[in-house]
């Protein structure tokens, strides 16, 4: 309501009132108030950090583990063979680590396995463990969807708990995800890869197309930096006024801080990280260039770590029934997908190691689940008609499109870890050599994996922040236990 005793309603005052009202409305829609702002509680003793930075190589869609990180006996295609006879659709190859083998087509990653650890027994026995988006949410947050509270992703946890390594670089950066979309699935992904209830300050800084650099670090054409600074001062003046609703509204202050940080980046050395086309050697560019933005995303991640980034997530864009989401023709499609990731991931590890950065940088390769011979194909494909979530053992493989691992399998997932205090040339966990390929040694819970990652970063597994008058832990209910066997 306007104050009738105020003789002049200035433009500045009008903007102030509108911003304050909008903030109050947003808080009501979120079901909270400024007083609900999360506050930290004292966790257990802080472990000694062995990593300063994290790079997550995110391969959504469900990577077939038996053709990649946990190869089984190669069973060549024969028309009429039974599904239960298929354990692997490619030969295995030796690696630089004694006794460790990978699926053929990963020769470059195989050459750096003496620097990494493979976890082969990650299990997900939750009700929705084999549903893409819910499994992705679980992998990234450690909580089931819906969690009652919008859970923060790992990147947001690291951002809030550790903050920035360099004041000019956001603590949480995402490379390669499409953000200009109206697709409901992708919009959901953008939500759960975000800050959750931590707020906009801990949202990822998005870089959709690494090869195009970051146009937002450049002033709008025709606008000099003086004019841009003047606009920034106007914004600060608006938000610095005395309306109580505005002064106590954390979301508004956080949005303003994000804009201030973006302006600061325009004058910072971090811009050089995007100049890889001009600064890198031709042979380096060739190693990362696989005809997909994922490759240059790995290169940009390395350059950002060199510049002082804290947490970077490089994504191979999720595409239902595309990419790693294979419901038919799995053998040939998997071969093509391995070619997309093999060189860039291996080159990233080599570059970090040669520059002395791998020791304090943790690189994680992960997907939401693995694959099994059971078939869940897309309607309209040649393979359509297989019993959903069947064991697949009695399926008759009638053509090559049916030859491959097409079913969602959450009970035997794999992860890779390089650097950051993890062991080198090491395998943890073992799965059976016969269907259904379940873990038979050292089955692992996701909350324990998260606890191990956080321990490497010096974050206790029971770190928590209060929201809605209750603690919310960085591992599921604070029950994560670090797997010390993975750590050097």
Which residue ranges define each predicted feature?
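Ligand-binding pockets and gating/stacking loops
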Residues: 1-488
């Amino acid at each position: 309501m306007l104050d009738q005793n105020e003789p002049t309603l200035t433009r500045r005052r009008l903007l102030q009132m509108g911003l304050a009202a909008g903030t109050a409305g947003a808080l009501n829609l979120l079901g909270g108030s400024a007083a609900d702002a999360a506050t930290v509680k004292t966790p257990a003793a802080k472990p000694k950090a062995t990593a300063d930075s994290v790079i997550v190589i995110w391969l959504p869609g469900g990577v077939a583990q038996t053709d990649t990180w946990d190869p089984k006996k190669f069973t060549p295609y024969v028309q009429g063979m039974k599904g239960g006879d298929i354990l692997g659709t490619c030969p295995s190859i030796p690696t630089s680590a004694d006794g460790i083998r990978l699926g053929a087509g990963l020769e470059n990653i195989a050459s750096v396995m003496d620097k990494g650890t493979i976890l082969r027994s990650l299990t997900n026995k939750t009700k929705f463990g084999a549903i893409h988006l819910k499994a992705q949410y679980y992998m990234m947050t450690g909580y089931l969807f819906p969690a009652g509270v919008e859970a923060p992703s790992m990147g947001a946890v690291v951002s809030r708990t550790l903050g920035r390594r360099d004041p000019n670089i956001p603590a949480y950066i995402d490379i390669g995800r499409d953000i200009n979309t109206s697709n409901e699935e992708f919009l959901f992904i953008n939500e759960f890869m975000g800050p959750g209830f931590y707020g906009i300050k801990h949202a990822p800084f998005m870089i959709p197309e690494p090869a195009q650099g970051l146009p937002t670090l450049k002033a709008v054409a025709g606008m000099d930096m003086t004019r841009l600074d003047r606009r920034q001062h106007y914004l600060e003046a608006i938000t610095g006024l005395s309306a109580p609703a505005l002064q106590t509204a954390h979301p508004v202050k956080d949005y303003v801080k994000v804009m201030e940080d973006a302006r600061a980046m325009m004058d910072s050395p971090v811009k050089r990280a995007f100049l890889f086309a001009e600064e890198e050697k031709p042979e380096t560019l060739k190693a990362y260039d696989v005809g997909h933005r994922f490759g240059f995303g790995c290169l940009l991640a390395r350059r950002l770590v060199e510049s002082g980034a804290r947490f970077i997530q490089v994504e191979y864009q999720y595409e239902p029934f595309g990419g790693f989401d294979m419901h038919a023709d799995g053998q040939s499609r998997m071969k093509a997908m391995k070619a997309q990731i093999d060189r860039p991931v291996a080159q990233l590890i080599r570059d970090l190691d040669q520059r002395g950065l791998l020791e304090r940088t943790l690189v994680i390769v992960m997907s939401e689940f693995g694959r099994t011979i059971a078939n869940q194909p897309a309607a309209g494909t040649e393979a359509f008609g297989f019993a959903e979530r069947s064991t697949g053992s009695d399926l008759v493989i009638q053509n090559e499109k049916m030859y491959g691992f097409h079913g969602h399998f959450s009970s035997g997932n794999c992860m890779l870890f390089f650097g950051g205090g993890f062991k080198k040339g090491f395998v943890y966990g073992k799965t059976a050599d016969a269907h259904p390929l379940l873990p038979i040694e050292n089955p692992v819970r996701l909350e324990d994996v998260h606890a191990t990652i956080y321990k490497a970063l010096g974050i206790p597994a029971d770190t928590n922040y209060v929201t809605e008058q209750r603690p919310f832990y960085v591992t599921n209910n604070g029950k994560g236990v670090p797997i010390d066997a993975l750590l050097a």
